[in-house]
From Swiss-Prot:
The keyword Transcription applies. Residues 352-377 bind DNA. Residues 453-471 have a biased composition (Low complexity). Coiled coil: none annotated. This is Probable transcription factor RL9. InterPro entries: Homeodomain-like_sf, KAN_fam, Myb_dom_plants, SANT/Myb. It comes from Oryza sativa subsp. japonica. Probable transcription factor that regulates abaxial identity during leaf development. Modulates leaf rolling by regulating the programmed cell death (PCD) of abaxial mesophyll and sclerenchyma cells during leaf development. One of its GO terms (cellular component) is nucleus.
Amino acid sequence: MAMVRELELMTSWSNSMGRHRYPTRILVDSFGHKCSASDKGVWTSCSIRAPLQGRGSFRRGANIRFGSLPSSAAVATSGGGRGGGGVVVGGGGGDPWRRLDGSTASTELSLSPPPAQAAGGGGGGGGADALPWRHRPSPPSSAVATTSAAAAAALMAPMMLQPLDAGGGASAPPPPIRGIPIYNGPGGFPFLQPSPTAGDVGHHHHHHPKMGFYSSYHHPSTWPSTSPSPLAAPPGAASSPLDPTAAFLSSPHHRMLSAASGRLNGMLSVSDTLRSYGVPGAAAPGVIGGAHHHHHHLHGGQPFVGALASRFMPKLPAKRSMRAPRMRWTSTLHARFVHAVELLGGHERATPKSVLELMDVKDLTLAHVKSHLQMYRTVKSTDKPAASSGPADGGSGDEEFAGGGQAASGGGDSMCLRGGGGGGVAAAAFAEHGRSASEGAASSVGGGGGGDMDQSSAGNTSTTRWSNSSRDPWLSSNSCNMDAHRSVGLSSPIENLEPCRSSSSQVSNHELSSPSLEFTLGRPDWHGADHD
């Protein structure tokens, strides 16, 4: 019957942080399978190379003690070995393991099962002592039966598939290293939620299902560990069943496979997960895991959990910034805009914020005013006569003109520019830019009488649209007969404007005297509800 024993020796191992020598405890059964190793309370595989071949990279003449686990028989001491005062600690007084014999000892270990022989003497001397390791005689049959029964009870527990936990009960989680908590998952498999047992109820929050993937990347001393538990089982604690999955993961064959695959456990699960996220190169996870693992240990063992997660998570498309809603610059709204600009000292001195505050129109945003002012400056700085509308918002594309409350017809043959009552001195000045001062004064509406000027763009057969780009010239609709405006004074501006007014843009004198300043941001029922 195999018996699990504890071997304590000095180990020499190295990683990216350098070479280290630590006293290490190894749990070995009588068949030579190394179950786990412990280094100062942190589980690690160190550099105990291939215990199945019977070799270990421990220091020559190290202080090696052998003792059984708590599930075995009581610990007893016997006489010393030849020339070195060796101490043999065994279970039931008949331990088959023995200490190295001083400075002349060999580093070879014989991990074969102990023979079942009759009881013999203890102490050094004799021909059998010429070997550095020799098998002590087994205890009497009664002691063998007791020890074997205890070992059998310990080896039957792995069928329960429970992780090796410190003390077998609800223990405190391992202390964080440099302020970084250590995440431990049973079996070392990533993306597996551990079953809630009595041992991990107290620290269930440490077993995050996604953090099992990064459980062995928090400290250099845990590399390249594949063991499932963070603490060694103390000799005085109750026995904990050994997980056969943990024994397989800690075997040298599995460590060799893990090293070949970038030392990432469960690479098939990782590959499938990455492939589902659409990560390129997910079919070769060893390259990704190995490269990042090496990069992690070159930087002092600090965790790269966030960086690793960001590499595996899909890139979310950047959300477009919220833009102002679509709107139509009616002639009334534009007249109010021009009036505000003139009050601020002209288009060169006016700012979008000041114009917005001076206009005081509901639902008008700074983006609307800014783009409209930009186009207004563009028109004022050119020699072309300008149209009567401006851009709707900062980058929303083409917009329709809607002049004077009428819908822009399919031919786009009518656009209306109405001056606001009480201050419409600049309504026609915007449309009459480029003309002389006298002509502009003749065509402008003064005082509080209010005015209405319609420009019919004859020959413009397409729907009146324009682009927001400041490079595009404004559509000029100067085909309206302006001779009537030049030949008459300010006495009857409305009568002389009648020939230019289209049939769909009839407005009342009451509306001209007190125009409505309400406007909508592209509501489909705006024309039919209020302005039919």
